[in-house]
Amino acid sequence: MSDATAASGPDWAPNDDQQELIDTLDGTVLVDAGPGTGKTFAVTRRYVNLLRSKPIEPGDVCLITFTRNAAAEMRERILDRSEASATTIGDAPIQTFHSLCQDIIKESGFDAPQLLGIDDQITADTRVVSNEIVEETLFEECYEQFRDAHPEHAAILRTVEDPGEIQGLIGELAAKGVFPTAEGWYRGGEAALEGDREAFVERFAALNEPRNGGSKQSRLREMLSSYGDTGLHLPDAPSKASVRGEGKQLPGEMAERVFEADREPLQRFVHDIYIAYLRFALSRNYLTFGFLQLFAFVLLCEDESVRDQVGFEYVMIDEFQDSSEIQFKLALLLARTENICVVGDWKQSIYGFQYADVENILEFDARLDRFAAELNADRPRIEYDTSVDRRIELSRNYRSTASIIEFATAALTTPASGSEEVDAEAVTERLGDLETAIPGVESRIEAIENDDEPAAILTAIGEMVDNDSYAVPDGDGGTRSPTYADIGVLTRTRDFGRSLQAAADEHGLPMAYEGGLEIFRTDQAKLLLAWLRILEADADRGWAVVLERAGYDLGACEAILETASYPDAMVAFRERLRATETLPGVMRTVFDRYGCTGPRAAVLIDTIESIHANTTLTRGGLVGVIARGIEHGTTQEIHAGAGADAVTVRTIHAAKGLEHPIVILANMNSGRFPSSGGSSGNISYEEGAGLRQRDVYAEADGQPYIYRDWKTEIARKCRPTAYDEERRLLYVALSRAQRHILCTAGGRPNTFLEELPVSLEPGVVDIPSFETEAEDRPVFEMPMPEPRGPRSSTPHELGATAEAAAGPAESAGGMSFGDRVHEFAEAYALGDPVAPANDHEEAVASFLDGLSGELRPEEHVHLPLEAEGQQVTLSGIIDLLQITDEAVAIVDYKTDADRTREESYRRQLSAYYHAIAELFPDRNTSVSLFWTGSGEQTEIEPLTRAEVAGFALS
């Protein structure tokens, strides 16, 4: 158990700061909760205290988190301490913004598009597209249709190289609350596109101020030494000399000249493609996360009855530093009273690329008043007092030592480049008084550099493991020598993590890369692309990959390609693929041939099936999608459970909320961290400069050409850098450490590493012998640190031992097939207009048609258990609950081709049995398995509650 999570155990007495939050129930409350301060513990205790102290129900309290895992954890903690029933807490609005918006729309928002003048509706079966690759593919299809249908925008479209930049712009505007209507912009949103003159001029002036007391030219003038070098300006653009001026700074009037721009054609283009994308999504019966929030916001703004219906007496928002502008405004509309509590830490705001706005928490008071005034501009919507009643600081860190806290805090004032000047005084004023709860413990904080950085890291890990000099907490108040699992390697970018994983595999060090993988760059994807190309017109590129994989050298490959005399076995396999009618069939046939199994192949199949199912792309079109995915490095989350004692590797973003006894912060190299960034695309938006277009198509002097817009070139030099967020990212990485930190670089240390208060030493390369075999080290998901006292689990985990003995179930079509059958079963039970697509679904439909009573698909249940002084709460989802006056039947669908795992399913269903028996004590409860392949139903004799508890706690 970690020190940080000890503060969240049920018997842990709250400290004074936590108790203040728990007891402060009314008014607007702003909580500064630094890393390791037990905020989840305090927030969930406050929730329980609300239910005990106020005449309210769980449905009157809205608790917003930013991930489903966080919501589930909070729900479990609340359930462990609340007198409310498991069903009541299970149904309570403890969820993400996106989930809450989806509920609002499903309940009251089918006509929401019409509020924007869109003649379409959201339906009961409108799906939410959460897969980024699927969303990108759908938008590209929309973009192609738009380009063909809107020749009036041809000049702008000629300058767009990547449709993804337009998709990103739409997402950014949606997060800002800028929405189109059929005829214009919602609630004057076009004003935001014009920019903020005062803010732009102020920033321009600050950058244009001469340095060193006037003896050195301004930073802006220095940056514009390359003005005009990267693109040809239109003939009427000013010269470099006139822009930069003769002195140490740009001429004073230049700020106004740069800000003024004719944005009308660009605004019209953005409006038209934005509204076209909304219409396209509705016509395809899907919404994105951004559109969920968009329509929920419009609905709450325009329909007072909906606000009254869904409003809450108490609103609590966790991780508020991760909120966007539209989410802040949604929170105001969801609150009936001033009882709003936001909890967050500006130092950990690292999701700007997902439209999080750190100013929401830094300028909470001002934004609270401003957003309320904006919402009340045309009629009263926010009628409660928006003044902040209480500020609370959680200042006791249960995770890290004093030296680690001090070292991490230094990151917030560390320059990111040699020329950057950090306003350390302003940063220090914002810092709270974070103190350690584990005084007197020494930490090792070290830094090394070596040209062979991966080898140096492996050497360092070998030195740390089983070394008492790197002692870590043992969970009982003492210390022990570290294991591999105590070490977490964090990187700014994924590519280094993959390189390190490869080095670890080569030397036998147990290591697992966790998180986003560039799925289309895997061997599985490249093989699939090769065979799809062979089936299409681009055969040579496909054959080259396949032949190389088969072991043919370059000369042999060239000879085969030149004569088209392909090996007979490969030709036969090609014909077999041609005879395969479906794309999923082609994929599985390819993967079966090459023995591609495991999570990577499964995620790849699921991703491509989703693209195929949700778009009109042909097989040839999918070849293009995979090829672009390889080029762009599109990522997808992959998790494969593993219980190995292994070092974990993650990006810093993926490590948010986690902790490790030892943190190795790797790849601290120039150009890698801080991120060197890159072009923001041709069309971009920034609050100060407004909507801008860098490259413009024009015919100057009768010659068509794409010119560089001189005003945008200068305006982009005035944009705020992302260095503040990079510093916060550095802070997050360092504050994951409990006891020790090692920073590493590969010969080009970045400014961060050079400026941090740590001695940079030469790294040693002397890799020891490791015992673990590479094949025993799959990618896996590191669990959250386990809290003291009651823990949570799922009924599925009860069958782990039996499943391991029986081996993996042989499904009729794999996990994605099973998911589709379950989705059909849920929709059919709800009465949705769906038709069976295969024999399994036919069997499900026939089974459901024969049932009487109330049918509840996908029913969430919770079962608290206790045995030998230990506690655990099982949570799960029942496929189908059939309720009649006399009985309650639990049904679990199984697509397995055989019944070898029936015993493991018995354990799972037994947990469901006891949970439901508690809810319906006056009715007979039964459990059964429905085998979709045969249409047979098997009654299950449930285990006793004590037996279930024994398995759960074993």
Annotate each predicted stretch with a short phrase.
Residues T483, Q501-A502, L529-R736, H740, ...:
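Conserved helicase C-terminal RecA-like lobe
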Residues G352, A447, D474-T479, L517, ...:
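Short, contiguous acidic/charged loop-to-helix segments that flank catalytic cores in large enzymes
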Residues S2-E76, M316-I317, Q321-V342, W346-D538, ...:
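Conserved motor-region signature of P-loop NTPase helicases/translocases
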Residues V647, R748-I878, Q882-I883:
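Nuclease catalytic cores
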Residues N285, E823-I890, D896, T900, ...:
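Catalytic cores of nuclease domains that cleave nucleic-acid phosphodiester backbones
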Residues S2-T37, F41-A42, D60-C62, E161-M316, ...:
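Accessory N-terminal region flanking or inserted into the helicase ATPase core
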